[in-house]
Amino acid sequence: MTGWIIYNGTLNIHKINKLVKSLVTEGKKLNIKLEAVKNTEIIPTYNNEGKAELLYLKELESPKFIIFWDKDVLLARHLEKMGFKVFNSSKAIEYCDHKGLMHLELSNNDIQMPRTILSPMIFDYLLNSEDYLIKCYEELGKEIIIKESKGSFGMQVYLIKGKEEFIKKVTELNKRNVDFIMQENIKSSYGKDIRVNIIGNKVIGAMLRESDKDFRANISQGGKGKLINLTTEQEEIALKVHNVLGLDFSGVDLLFGEDNKPILCEVNSNLNFLSFEELWGKSFGAEILKYILEECLW
C-alpha cells in the first residue's frame, strides 16, 4: 500500500524532519510505502472546467491515504476534494491551528477551559479604543495569558503582568495585525500540564510535563516529561475534546485546576510524539499507521 506524508517544505525544523523519517521507517515495517512529500512539491490547481487537480514537482505514486503533517489547510481540503482520504481531516486541522476557532468549536460542550476572550478584528490600530482592553483586563485579572492564534511548541504565548504591560502587548499585536486570544492565568498549573496522546477513540498514553524555569511546560521550552496514569475525569475530557473536533490522532493538553480538576489548555493535530515515544518505549507512529490501515479497509 502506498501513502503520502505531507509536511511543510519551508520549515527546516529538526524534530519535524525526524518525525517524518520515523513514520516512513515504521511504514516499511508494515509493508507501507510511505512517501515524504513537501507541501511545495505538489501544486493545487483547477482546470478550465473547475476540476481540482495537482501539478507535481516530482514523480509520485497515487496514494491510498495521506497523512497531513502540516497546517496548509487549503491544500488538505483540495486533496479531499480530489477524493483522497486525509488524516487528520482539513477541518480538524483548521480547528486546532487557530486557538480562537478551537475554543469557539469546543464551546457549549460542557468542557472546562480557562476564561477566554477573543480579540476583535482590527483594521487600524490607531482608531482602536482602549475601553475594550480595560474591560478585558478587569475580567481576566492582573495576570493574563495572551496567545497568538497560530503558534506551536509553546511559542507566541505570553504571561502578562499588570495593565500597562497588557495594553502594550495587545497594541503590538494589533500593529502586526495578529489574531490572538486572552485568558485568565491558571496559577495552579504554573509550569506543569498533561499531554494526552490519542489515536482513534483510545488514549494511548499520557505524559506529565513540568518546568521549573518557565510558566510553559512544553518540552521544546525546556520542560521535562514523565509517563503518568490519567484519572477517569482527565481521560474523559481529553477524549471528548478529541471527538468534538473530529480528530483521528491528537495531543490534548490539560491544565491543573483547583483540586487538580482538569482544564483544557489546547489541542494539537500535528503533535510532536517523539518525546512521548522515548518514555513509552514503543512506536506511537506505528500505532497511527495501524489505525489508518484499519480505516482504509472500510
What are these regions (language model features)?
Residues 155-241:
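Phosphate-binding site of ATP-dependent enzymes
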Residues 71-73, 92, 209, 255-259:
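Short glycine-enriched loops at secondary-structure junctions
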